[in-house]
Amino acid sequence: MASIAVCPGSFDPVTYGHLDIIKRGAHIFEQVYVCVLNNSSKKPLFSVEERCELLREVTKDIPNITVETSQGLLIDYAKRKNAKAILRGLRAVSDFEYEMQGTSVNRVLDESIETFFMMTNNQYSFLSSSIVKEVARYNGSVSEFVPPEVELALQQKFRQG
């Protein structure tokens, strides 16, 4: 049986921190489904379709990555994909506290799917999509935080607004 993982997130936008976790997950698992989700507590800058397209562009050279979106519960998506793992990135203790809640719920819903926490590399420990959007909104350079395709998309988005 293939080792399949789901790497979920809102990815609004995808950052080098996200890519760090995705790429490292791709070295561990035979197949990684990157699942773009809507976070109901956030107002996204990019549509789900735009986020999927950006992710596909920046992961196109990784053959065992598939980018999709899903509505509903993450655990149901993982079951549909026959995934045995959910891959989550952590930057700090505060991330762990937040992620533990979701993991605990997922364990109640289906205890056969494990959650793997991966610490991001230190150079990305401060990085978040919110910070990237804030810097880009005020015309700051985000080239150290996101791939060039994402930087261009941010510039275009804020020029429109």
UniProtKB/Swiss-Prot annotation:
Q: Which UniProt keywords apply?
A: ATP-binding, Coenzyme A biosynthesis, Cytoplasm, Magnesium, Nucleotide-binding, Nucleotidyltransferase, Transferase
The gene it comes from is coaD
**What are its cofactors?**
Mg(2+)
Where along this sequence does the record place binding of substrate?
S10, K42, L74, R88
Q: So what family is this one in?
A: Belongs to the bacterial CoaD family.
* Location in or out of the cell: Cytoplasm
* One function term, GO molecular function aspect: ATP binding
Q: Which reaction(s) does its UniProt entry say it catalyses?
A: (R)-4'-phosphopantetheine + ATP + H(+) = 3'-dephospho-CoA + diphosphate
Claim: RNA-binding is one of the keywords in the record: no
Organism from which the protein derives? Bacillus subtilis (strain 168)
- Binding locations of ATP: S10, F11, H18, R88, G89, E99, Y124, S125, F126, L127, S128, S129, S130
| Superkingdom classification of source | Bacteria
Annotated pathway: Cofactor biosynthesis; coenzyme A biosynthesis; CoA from (R)-pantothenate: step 4/5
Main location as per UniProt: cytoplasm
InterPro entries given for it?
Cyt_trans-like (IPR004821), PPAT (IPR001980), Rossmann-like_a/b/a_fold (IPR014729)
Task: State what this protein does.
Answer: Reversibly transfers an adenylyl group from ATP to 4'-phosphopantetheine, yielding dephospho-CoA (dPCoA) and pyrophosphate.
Organism classification, top ranks? Bacteria, Bacillati, Bacillota, Bacilli, Bacillales
Q: What is this protein called?
A: Phosphopantetheine adenylyltransferase
Q: Where is this site: Transition state stabilizer?
A: H18
Quaternary structure note: Homohexamer.
Name the GO cellular-component terms.
Answer: cytoplasm
| Annotated GO biological process | coenzyme A biosynthetic process
Write the Enzyme Commission number(s) for this entry: 2.7.7.3
